[in-house]
Each structure stands twice: as C-alpha cells, then as structure tokens.
Amino acid sequence: MLNPIVHRFQYGKHIVILETGIVARQATAAVMVNMADTIVLVTVVGVKQVKPGQKFFPLMVNYQERTYAAGRFPGGFFRREGRPSEGEILISRMIDRPLRPLFPDGFLNEVQVIATVVSINPQVSPDIVAMIGVSAALSISGIPFNCPFGAARVGYINNQYVLNPTIAELVDSSLDLVVASTANAVLMVESEAKQLSEEQMLSAIIFGHEQQQLVIQNINHMVTIVGKPKWSWQAQVIDTNLQLCVTELAESRLNEAFCISDKQERDVCIETIKSDVLSALQQKNETIEEETISNIFANLEKQIARNRILGGKLRIDGRNHKMIRSLDMRTSILPRTHGSALFVRGETQALVTVTLGTERNAQNIDELIGERTDRFLLHYNFPPYCVGEIGLVGSPKRREIGHGRLAKRGILAVMPTANEFPYTVRVVSEITESNGSSSMASVCGTSLALMDAGVPIKAAVAGVAMGLIKEDNNFVILSDILSNEDYIGDMDFKVAGSKNGITALQMDIKTKGITNNIIQLALNQAKDARMHILNMMEQVISMSRTDISPFAPRIHTIKIHPDKIKDVIGKCGSVIRALTEETKTIIDIEDDGTVTVAATDSIKAQQAICRIKDITAEIEVGSIYHGKVTRIVDFGAFIAISSNKEGLVHISQITNKRVEKVADYLSIDQIVLVKVLEVDRQGRIRLSMKDTNLTNK
C-alpha cells in the first residue's frame, strides 16, 4: 500500500511540495518536487560496496526533460526523446557541481542521480526545482552526504533583487544568477549579467544564500521524518610508512621542479621524479602497487605546491599572486573568414573566428518552455593536441558545451540587437593550446574577433579565472590561474566583463569556510586583472571596424506592404525562387513586410531590391508605363508593364484608326507605351495606347 510523505513550504512567491514514498520506491531514495506545476522526479541510487580497484568517486548526474511534461510530442522520425540536448547537459553539470564537495573525502561508492521533468509550467524553470529535489533525495537516502544544500535563482529588476523570477520577469532582468549553498557557505554560482558592478553581484550572491536557508531548513525537517540511517563506510587507509618514504625521496626534488616556469619542461621533470620514486620503492618491495605510490605522489605534489603559495613564495611559473601571464593578441589572421583573432595568455591560446549569416542561419531551439530562435552561436572546441595528448575527435563533450556556454554568457550583454545588426553571428573558439583558463581566453578572443568582423558590440569584454589556496585562516587569492593551480586550489572563480561591469560569473568552491569577505576580495582582484587585459586589448583593436568583410553577405532591408508578400513569393514560391537564382542573393520576408536581401555582391543585391520594388509597385490609374507585348489575341494584346503585372490593350485602344488585325500593329516582345485606364476589384488592368500613339510611332 502506498504511504506518501508530503511536506510543503512557501519559497518566495511559490509553494514547494516535496513528496516521497509513492513513486520509484526501489531506488535508494526518490523525491517528487512540485513548484507551481513544474514537477521534477529525482531518484538516487547508491551502491554500498566499492568496486575493487576503484580510485575515484563515480558520481553520475543526469537531468532529462520529457516532452509529455508540456503536453507535446517529441520531434524527429521516431517521435521519441534521444540524446540529451545542450540545455539538459548544462543543467546536469549545474546540479553536479555543488554535489561533489558534499560527499566525504575518500568515498568511492557508485552513486547515480537522475532528475526527470514530468510536468512543466512555462513560467517556472525546472533547474531550481531539480536542484532542490536532488538535495532532498540525497539527504534522506542514507548515502554518506555531509548536509543538504539549497538553490535559488536571483534576478535584478528595477534595482531590486527578485527571488526565483519567472521566465517573463527574466526578460526585464539585468541579472540571471543561480546560487547553491549550504547553511554556512556558498558552493556554486552561475550567472549572466548586463554589466553589473562587483558590489551588485556580491549582494545578489548573499541575497540568494540567505533566501535558500528556508529550503535547507525544510529538507532537514524532512530528514527527521523519513531520513534513512547513514551507511557505515570506511575510507581507504593510507600507508603512513609508504607516505614517509615517498616524501623523503621526492620532496626536495619537487620543490626544485616547481621553480621551472615552462609547463612542458616542468611536467617532464616531475614525471622523471615520479618514475625514480616508483623504481626505488618497487625495488625494495615488489608487492607495492604502482597506483598506490602514484596517488601518494600526487597528494605530495599538491601539498608542496599549496604550501609554497601559502608561504609567500612565487607561483609555479614564477609570478606573484596578482600577476597576469604575458599577453599576445592579433586580429585578421585568417583572410577568408569574416572575422578572426588569436588570443594568447601564457601557455593558453584561443583561435577565434566569426561567421556572419542571415536570419535563416539562426538556430531554432525547441525547449519544454517553448520554441525560440538564437541569432548568436558560440562553439568551443578543446582538441586533445592543445594539451599535448592523443584522444578521440568527434562531437562536443559535456565540458566543451559548458565552457562554450560560459563564454557566450560573457559576451551576450554587449551584443547588438537584431535592429542594430541584422545578422546571425556564429563564433567558434578553437583552443589550440591550454594551460588553464581556456574559457576566459575564449571570451577575450571572441571580443577581439567580433570587433574585427565589424560587429558593433557595445563594449570590449575580457575574462579571467581566479583561484584560492586556503588553510584555516590563511589564504591567498590567485589571478589568472594555471591548470595545476586549478587542480590544487580550493576555488575556481571565473569572471568576465567590460570596463562598465560584470557580464558573467561562475564560481565553484571545493572547501568549507569561504566567507563573503573572501568572495569580495576575489571580485576586486578579478576586476584589476580584467582592466589590465582590456587595456592590452585596446592597443590591438579599440572599436569595431566600420565595415564588414568583403566575403561576408551584405544585408539590405526594405519594407513592402504585407498584402504584396504573395506577389514577391509567387505561386508555390516561383517568383522568389527565380529572383534568388537570377541575382545570386538570399531573400527573406517577414510577416510584417520586412524584406532582407543578402549578397556578397552589392550590385546583385541592388538588382534584387529593384526587382522587388518593381513587383510591389502600385499601378496608378492615368500613369504611362513602358510595356512589353507578351500575347496577341483577336480582341487585343496583353502588355507586361512590370515583372508581374500584365494588362490588356483592347483592339479598340490600340490606335484611333479602325484596326482589323492586331498583328498588323503589334508583335511579340515589342516595347510600347501604355496608359492605365482602370484597375478593377480583381486587380485586372485595362490599358490604352491611344494617348501615347505619337510616342509609339
């Protein structure tokens, strides 16, 4: 018999309903979360036995949307959901990021979290609902999980912070920020902003953290009612004697290796030290597993690097904690692209290209909350060669999709509107070399490439990745972190923005005790770094070029009466098809009569525009036109007075004399002058040559 446990609470303007005990009862835990009819089923399954040889935490997070949630059929031939969409992948990553720090160190059991959207209110985004459900399900599951976390979306409308704004409210918001946190600390931030200040962004994070305490309190209350006992588990025991041996053999040599600034040279040196340690220890005891030694060596490497920074020494590559790596920037490096730039920061470089297209190149996105068209595409590629590795090359991975979206968020606020720049814009960032902060290099490279392409962005944008090393009350904030510093650090904090303010912010925290003061210091230090990079970018290109590439399509816009659209299109598209083929142009017509003509050749575009004006021109009674004889019949002749307008000259209107045979006066393709006598209700045109006979002679 079903025995539901239901818990309700008010969260902002919405009531949240947490329900368990009815659906998915064979999962370790399952919670159905309802927020204003947006319902997400969250299931958690954990395995109590660790797989033999397991060396990492195998957490899987899958967020999936079902079209039945919106009362719709899936697209495609099979009418069934297929591979995850980009939106589903991004939300899966957003759920995953605050989860990982909350599992205890050394916990290696398999855990899978699946969040399925089963009902959707088009005004309530399911991502926050899913995150609340995941927190609740893990908290009651009995799986070792430190504490529940909350989630909130924060908007900024009319100088006021808004908790969980609706989709409609977000249109008017200058901020879209998602924050997840525990009762004591922020875990994750993902945001997009319209050039807000550091103070405004910090206040938004604090606001979201404070508001979601209600979620955490209610999940804790639910745990007291239905929570399962925590599993007993034991972390892998570290051999302290082996640890001492590794430290004795490697510590001094690693300290020397960390003085080598070149990444490849340093990596070779560290690999040599590791190989020597393995060889020495296995000669003493052949039963010691290589992987065990490697893990101890990696932990020692991490601790030495952290201690050096906390002790006030220079960083791995010889910089102090605020210094930015050397910068090199170039534009117009690929002659046939519509815009291009190479952005180099230390050993990280992004080759960025811009392609301009028409409205028909825009991406049509079908989401549960409705369809939309995206005119700005940004794709990020991270090939294996950029880190000196061999790997599979194919469709983008989750990481590439996530980094591309972050870079896009950083640029969106400065992109022109469709009225200001009627092009679809595609940016591709090829990471050709990587040693940290490649997503922020993509932001800088994109800004340069857009200006090179003549896209009138509102301001230049730069991005920088910040890091943190913290032990108790001692901490150091790092500007422009390397990949090693990302690995050893306690925070990954990416900030993009212009000189006017922040456009995107992403933060992931891996440790406890990150205070608001630390976040404020990191934001201020990131601003200094951003300003330095922007100043360097201005020396390369300070504003968008006044003209687009000669290889890009020129878009010309004219307005016609909506009633004339059918004339331009023609029967089954015959007129517009012939026109595009003849003039080698791309023609798009909107319902309001806006016509866009795109062509790389301006002369061809003008030819198409003249033809469209000719087709849509109003025929005025009493006006005289040049016309071509198209047909001769017994009772007169048909004269084409425009490309799609034809009128009849009756035999009695050819001349003032009596005409016995029309062919005696007119021939096919003859050019004559005609006067419009009448246009009837059906659009039929009656013409006369009488008043123009002198000219026709």
From Swiss-Prot:
One of its GO terms (molecular function) is RNA binding. Its EC number is 2.7.7.8. Residues 622-690 form the S1 motif domain. Its main location: cytoplasm. GO terms for cellular component: cytosol. One of its GO terms (biological process) is RNA processing. CDD domains: KH-I_PNPase, RNase_PH_PNPase_1, RNase_PH_PNPase_2, S1_PNPase. Its cofactor is Mg(2+). Keywords: Cytoplasm, Magnesium, Metal-binding, Nucleotidyltransferase, RNA-binding, Transferase. It comes from the Bacteria. It is found in: Cytoplasm. The keyword Metal-binding applies. Mg(2+) binds at residues 486, 492. Signal peptide: none annotated. Residues 553-612 form the KH domain. PROSITE patterns: KH_TYPE_1 (PS50084), S1 (PS50126). The keyword Metal-binding applies. It catalyses: RNA(n+1) + phosphate = RNA(n) + a ribonucleoside 5'-diphosphate. It is an enzyme of class 2 (transferase). InterPro entries: ExoRNase_PH_dom1, ExoRNase_PH_dom2, ExoRNase_PH_dom2_sf, KH_dom, KH_dom_type_1, KH_dom_type_1_sf, NA-bd_OB-fold, PNPase. Involved in mRNA degradation. Catalyzes the phosphorolysis of single-stranded polyribonucleotides processively in the 3'- to 5'-direction. Belongs to the polyribonucleotide nucleotidyltransferase family. Component of the RNA degradosome, which is a multiprotein complex involved in RNA processing and mRNA degradation. PANTHER family: POLYRIBONUCLEOTIDE NUCLEOTIDYLTRANSFERASE, POLYRIBONUCLEOTIDE NUCLEOTIDYLTRANSFERASE 1, MITOCHONDRIAL. This is Polyribonucleotide nucleotidyltransferase. It comes from Baumannia cicadellinicola subsp. Homalodisca coagulata. The lineage of its organism: Bacteria, Pseudomonadati, Pseudomonadota, Gammaproteobacteria, Candidatus Palibaumannia.
